[in-house]
C-alpha cells in the first residue's frame, strides 16, 4: 500500500534537524567555555563585564530557543512518521 508519504524523506529531514541541533549545542558549549575563560582570566572589568554578560544571556536564550525549536521539529516529524505508518498498517490489515 502506498500512501504517497515518503518516510525516507521525512526521516532524512528529522535526522538533519537532529544534526543541526547537535551543531547548535556544540556552538553554545564552545561559546560558554570561551566566556568562562574570559571571566576567569579577569579580562572584563566592572560595567564592561556586566554589559558583556547581559548580551551573552540574550544570545544564549535565543540560541536555546532555536535549539528547542529544531529538536521539537525533529520530534514532530518522527511522531508523524510513526502515526502515518500505524494508520497505513491498520488500513492495510483491514483490506486484507
Predicted region positions:
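N-terminal secretion-targeting helices of virulence/extracellular proteins
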Residues: 1-96
Amino acid at each position: 500500500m502506498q500512501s504517497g508519504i515518503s518516510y525516507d524523506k521525512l526521516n532524512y529531514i528529522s535526522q538533519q534537524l537532529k544534526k543541526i541541533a547537535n551543531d547548535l549545542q556544540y556552538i553554545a558549549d564552545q561559546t560558554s567555555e570561551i566566556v568562562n575563560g574570559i571571566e576567569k582570566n579577569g579580562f572584563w572589568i566592572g560595567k564592561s563585564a556586566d554589559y558583556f554578560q547581559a548580551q551573552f544571556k540574550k544570545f544564549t536564550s535565543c540560541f536555546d530557543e532555536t535549539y528547542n525549536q529544531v529538536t521539537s521539529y525533529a520530534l514532530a516529524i518522527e511522531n508523524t512518521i510513526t502515526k502515518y505508518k500505524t494508520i497505513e498498517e491498520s488500513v492495510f490489515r483491514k483490506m486484507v
